[in-house]
Structures are given as C-alpha cells and as structure tokens.
Amino acid sequence: MESAPAAPDPAASEPGSSGSEAAAGSRETPLTQDTGRKSEAPGAGRRQSYASSSRGISVTKKTHTSQIEIIPCKICGDKSSGIHYGVITCEGCKGFFRRSQQSNATYSCPRQKNCLIDRTSRNRCQHCRLQKCLAVGMSRDAVKFGRMSKKQRDSLYAEVQKHRMQQQQRDHQQQPGEAEPLTPTYNISANGLTELHDDLSTYMDGHTPEGSKADSAVSSFYLDIQPSPDQSGLDINGIKPEPICDYTPASGFFPYCSFTNGETSPTVSMAELEHLAQNISKSHLETCQYLREELQQITWQTFLQEEIENYQNKQREVMWQLCAIKITEAIQYVVEFAKRIDGFMELCQNDQIVLLKAGSLEVVFIRMCRAFDSQNNTVYFDGKYASPDVFKSLGCEDFISFVFEFGKSLCSMHLTEDEIALFSAFVLMSADRSWLQEKVKIEKLQQKIQLALQHVLQKNHREDGILTKLICKVSTLRALCGRHTEKLMAFKAIYPDIVRLHFPPLYKELFTSEFEPAMQIDG
C-alpha cells in the first residue's frame, strides 16, 4: 500500500457533474480575472448549457462565457468556465487551486509524482494536480493584473478561433441531407459497424477511438479512461510461499464452489490472498465514478415532480440515448477496473474481450448498489437521485422494476467496498462464458478471487451463508442483462438508425447482435 497519500479533497469531486464541481450561476465574463471568492454548488455541472454561438468571437465586455468555454480546462480537460487565476480552467480546478492557496497545504504524491491529471483522475492526487496548476501558470498574483493586455486578448482570440474551427470541421463531416442528430453525435465507419475486437482492444490499451469522440460541446458525456502509472498492481510472483493453505472444497474453507474442473482447485498462500484482495480493492476504489461517501451525502437530492415530468415527456429515443451514454460511461470505468486486476492482462486478448463483453454490464449493476437509496427507492442518475418514474419514457417499466428490485436486494446486504470489489472481480472472471480460449486459466483466477472474497468476508465477521447469497446473485445478474438485451433489440427494431448513428460505439459493440460474428472462433 502507498505511504501517507493525501486525503481526497471532498469539495473537489461532486458526483453527477460533467465538470464535476461547476457552480451554477457563478460565472465571470471570460476576459476578466477571477478573485476566487465565489461559492461553488455541488453537482451543478450537469445542468450547464453546452450551447455556443456560431458567430465570430468579439473580445469585448459582451463576450459570453460560452464563447470561451469552447477551450477546455488547461488542467484537466473538462469544460472550462472562464479565466481563473490567470488560466482558463473549469470550476473544479479553480476551487481546488483557491483552497490550496488559502490553506497553504502541502500535498504528497503516493506514486512517482507524474500522475495523469484529467477529468476522471484529477481528485486522486492533489500533489500532481497542484503542480500542474502551477506549471500552466495559475497564480494568486494573477488577480492583481486586471484586464488582459492586447497581446493576451489576441492570443486568446486565436485559440478560441482554432477550437471553433475544429468544431465546425467536425460538424461539417455530417452527410448532407442527414437528419439532425441527437447529441452527442459519434462518428462511425462507412458501413455503420466497427469490429469489436479492434475497437474494444483500443479501449483495452487505454485510449478512446478517435472516431468515437464526441465534439467538444458534449465531450463530457464520453470519458477518456487512461491507465495510471502504477496500474501494474502488486507482484504476486514475488510473495514467499509460506504459510501454505489448502483451500480446496474438501478443506471446508471453500464450501460453496461450483467449479467444474477439480484439477484447478487452488493451493495458495495467505499472503497471496491478502495481496490479491488488496490489489482488487485498490483497483475498484481507483475506478469508481463517485466516492461512496459523497453519494450518501446527497441522497436527499431527488428530482422534483416537474423534473420527473420533463424526463417522462422526453421522446423515447432521446431517453434511450441518454441512458446508453450513462451506461457507457460506467462501463469504461469497469474496463479500467478489469485492466488493473492482477492476472487479467495476462489473458489472451480474445478472452479479455469476451469477459468484458459478457460481464461489464453485470459489474455496472453490482456497482449500482453504491448509488442506491433503499429508503426512498431511488438511484443516482444524471445529477440527482431518481425514482423508477423518471425512466417511464423508455417504454420498459418491467425491466426498470427489475433493476430497482436488484439494486434494493444487493443494497440490503450492506457490502463493504472490499466486498463489492471482490464480488465484481469474481463476476467478471466467469470461466463459463462462451468463446473463451483459456477456460482453465480463467477458472483458476476466478477461484483465487472467490477465495479472497471468502477470506475478506470471514475477516469482516459476516454472517454464515452470505457468500452463498452473493453467488446466487450471479444468475439474477445474467437474467437482468439478458432482459436489457431483449429491450435493446426491441428498441433497435423500431429505431435502427438511432442505434446505428447515435448510440456510443462501445455500447453497440457490447450489446447489439450485429457484432456477434466478431466473437466466433474457429474450432
């Protein structure tokens, strides 16, 4: 484990915002300097407008914030809100820098002082985030300089024009006569399809395919997940092999196994189990969209009746697309989680893709229990806690009821983060998936994960039978994902062009049947 990492900045990571810490109504004119005294409202980022003028930029007092917001935050790449402390930044990085200066804080880096700072990772290392703020020129003294010089205005004008031209070029790629797309728009190949193997392999390498990036006005919907410098995890091969524990089914420690190959029953050291559990728990915490504590603090923020009616009045295809985007965001975090699990990247590429294709949504549903409030039957969605009524316009109330029932059931088990992490990894490494090439290798890995899960459950003094209950959830998860596929296919039959043109590519690759041939393996 790392030594003395800085504690996360609780005010710098509000869930549910594309620019996670944006403040509603706290915008400055873009060419004035920020004094850093304005308050920030949590979760306001998702309500920001992404509208931008198509007219030229006039660098005057009348310049609207939306014109400068076309330039992303210089620190994390999120949607900017103006010039703060001399640099174009988002509200979150502005607030983080202000707090760091007010408290004269000293941060430490748990890694090698070269952490990637982007929209998804900015809250993981305060030291590297502050160093990047300083490197790009943020300064408390910047507020003293007043308005920009002509040279600075000209430079800003040129940069805005460059970003606007890039956006217009992307807009012009739309075919003449094509129906106006729902936002966000994703570019696709000429035949409307992409190869699952090639494109998901790109996600496995830690990069978003160029052809699938949304334009800058909506890029916050589609996340670029990149590996951290220490994603290799713990070196299990270096662990000394004592004490040895025989955790075979006959030993009594492993009473709930349903593995088919008895020869794969593992003999592992207690140290190896501890390290595997630590690796998976760490990977889980580093790849969760939101901190659990933050989610629990805002359970009272439910949608008002007027807001619920707004969702209910959305066109069916619009609501489907919104949910597809949200699911895709969550799945990209699951992909990163899988990559960090010891042993996963040693699997052949075919098996990595098969496991993710089959299990990523199941892990999303497991993680949903972190964002579920069983007291009022709501789940965190699009910035607030939503009841089943919010999803009425999808036209699949039975499926939504199934989702909420599962969320409530799993939530009632009061799983810790370690237990959620290990159960997620166990589900992801299912050796009974179709088209796997190295089933025995995956079965051994899954057995070790289940041993680690049982070890953690016993350490936590959980009641007898909880592992059995968890394993029984696997069949429910598969039924839930099967129902999702049924509903998607029914929707696709009515709106094929919406799915083909406007759903996120990764979502289509994972869930639409047209990609199944890519998974067929000779022999």
From Swiss-Prot:
Q: How is it modified after translation?
A: Phosphorylation by conventional PKCs in neurons inhibits transcriptional activity. Phosphorylated on Thr-183 by MAPK1/ERK1 in vitro.
Annotated SUPFAM superfamilies: Glucocorticoid receptor-like (DNA-binding domain), Nuclear receptor ligand-binding domain
Instruction: List modified residues, type N6-methyllysine.
Output: 38
Region of interest: Disordered: 1-63, 154-183
Instruction: Give the Gene Ontology MF terms in alphabetical order.
Output: beta-catenin binding; DNA binding; DNA-binding transcription factor activity; DNA-binding transcription factor activity, RNA polymerase II-specific; ligand-modulated transcription factor activity; nuclear receptor activity; oxysterol binding; RNA polymerase II cis-regulatory region sequence-specific DNA binding
| Biased segments, Low complexity type | 1-26
**Which residues, renumbered to this chain, carry the PTM Phosphothreonine?**
183
Motif AF-2, per the record, lies over 506-511
Question: In its keyword annotation, does this UniProt entry include Transcription?
Answer: yes
- State the compartments where it is located: Nucleus
Question: What does the record give as the DNA-binding region?
Answer: 73-138
According to the UniProt entry, the cross-link of type Glycyl lysine isopeptide (Lys-Gly) (interchain with G-Cter in SUMO) is at: 240
Q: Which Gene3D superfamilies match?
A: Erythroid Transcription Factor GATA-1, subunit A, Retinoid X Receptor
Keywords from UniProt, A to Z, are: Activator, Biological rhythms, Developmental protein, Disease variant, DNA-binding, Isopeptide bond, Metal-binding, Methylation, Nucleus, Phosphoprotein, Receptor, Transcription, Transcription regulation, Ubl conjugation, Zinc, Zinc-finger
Record flagged with keyword Cytoplasm: no
InterPro entries reported in the protein's UniProt record: NHR-like_dom_sf, NR_DBD_ROR, Nucl_hrmn_rcpt_lig-bd, Nuclear_hrmn_rcpt, ROR_rcpt, Znf_hrmn_rcpt, Znf_NHR/GATA
UniProt xrefs under CDD domains: NR_DBD_ROR (cd06968), NR_LBD_ROR_like (cd06939)
Q: Which PROSITE patterns does UniProt cross-reference here?
A: NR_LBD (PS51843), NUCLEAR_REC_DBD_1 (PS00031), NUCLEAR_REC_DBD_2 (PS51030)
Give expression by tissue: Expressed in cerebellum, heart, liver, lung, kidney, retina and brown and white adipose tissues. Expressed in the subset of mature Th17 cells.
Q: State the conditions that upregulate or repress this gene.
A: In T(H) cells, induced upon antigen receptor ligation in the presence of IL6 and TGB1 (via STAT3). Oscillates diurnally in central nervous system. In liver, Isoform 1 oscillates diurnally but not isoform 4.
Q: How does it assemble?
A: Monomer. Interacts (via the DNA-binding domain) with HIF1A; the interaction enhances HIF1A transcription under hypoxia through increasing protein stability. Interacts with CEBPB; the interaction disrupts the interaction CEBPB:EP300. Interacts with the coactivators NCOA2, PPARGC1A (via LXXLL motif), EP300 and MED1. Interacts with the corepressor NCOR1. Interacts with MAGED1 and CTNNB1. Interacts with CRY1 and PER2. Interacts (via AF-2 motif) with PROX1. Interacts with NRIP1. Isoform 4 interacts (via AF-2 motif) with isoform 1 of FOXP3 (via LXXLL motif).
Give the domain section of the comments.
Answer: The AF-2 (activation function-2) motif is required for recruiting coregulators containing LXXLL motifs.
Q: Which PANTHER family match?
A: NUCLEAR HORMONE RECEPTOR HR3-RELATED, NUCLEAR RECEPTOR ROR-ALPHA
Question: What family is it from?
Answer: Belongs to the nuclear hormone receptor family. NR1 subfamily.
What is this protein's function per UniProt?
Nuclear receptor that binds DNA as a monomer to ROR response elements (RORE) containing a single core motif half-site 5'-AGGTCA-3' preceded by a short A-T-rich sequence. Key regulator of embryonic development, cellular differentiation, immunity, circadian rhythm as well as lipid, steroid, xenobiotics and glucose metabolism. Considered to have intrinsic transcriptional activity, have some natural ligands like oxysterols that act as agonists (25-hydroxycholesterol) or inverse agonists (7-oxygenated sterols), enhancing or repressing the transcriptional activity, respectively.
Q: What is this protein called?
A: Nuclear receptor ROR-alpha
* Source species of the chain: Mus musculus
